[in-house]
């Protein structure tokens, strides 16, 4: 009887071991320069808000690696140190590699392994440029309130048109 229990236990543990080895995962890895001793957070951007998935205190080389169970539908994550954020899209079991430089990692980074992540970076940079344009218009002392409103509307409409034609209409089902 104890031999049967031992054999069953061994078989169950072996099956569990194989299942865990075969678990499909995605990977986010890379390095962030100039961020030694900073805490890098890997966060899920879900419908219930931001949830921390994992974190790591970066060493002198800034290397990091996170992974998670493969997703059935694309999900958004972000890498964050303080107020600096890099948005990442995960689809299936891909490996996304990020190389960045702190403290300007939100704008000074490279991403590979995902076309979606590259597009997200382009859109984030475009949005930052839009915000800068709006701020410059609002601070212009030569413009009255109506001229500011008109100018802001024009740059926002130009931004929307650009996003529609270069991203949405280009791949409407993506």
List PLM regions with ranges.
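Amphipathic alpha-helical repeat scaffolds of TPR domains
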Residues: 172-174
């Amino acid at each position: 009887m104890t031999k049967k229990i031992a054999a069953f236990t061994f078989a169950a543990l072996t099956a569990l071991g194989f299942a865990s080895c075969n678990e499909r995962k995605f990977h986010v890895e890379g390095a962030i320069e100039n961020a030694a001793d900073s805490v890098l957070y890997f966060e899920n951007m879900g419908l219930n808000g931001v949830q921390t998935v994992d974190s790591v205190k970066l060493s002198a080389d800034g290397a990091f690696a996170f992974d998670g169970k493969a997703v059935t539908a694309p999900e958004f994550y972000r890498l964050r140190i303080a107020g600096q954020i890099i948005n990442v899209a995960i689809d299936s079991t891909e490996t996304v590699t990020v190389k960045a430089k702190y403290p300007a990692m939100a704008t000074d980074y490279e991403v590979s392994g995902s076309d979606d992540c590259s597009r997200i970076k382009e859109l984030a940079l475009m949005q930052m440029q839009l915000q800068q344009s709006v701020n410059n218009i609002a601070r212009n002392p030569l413009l009255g309130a109506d001229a500011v409103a008109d100018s802001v509307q024009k740059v926002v409409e130009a931004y929307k048109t650009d996003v529609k034609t270069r991203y949405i209409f280009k791949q409407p089902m993506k």
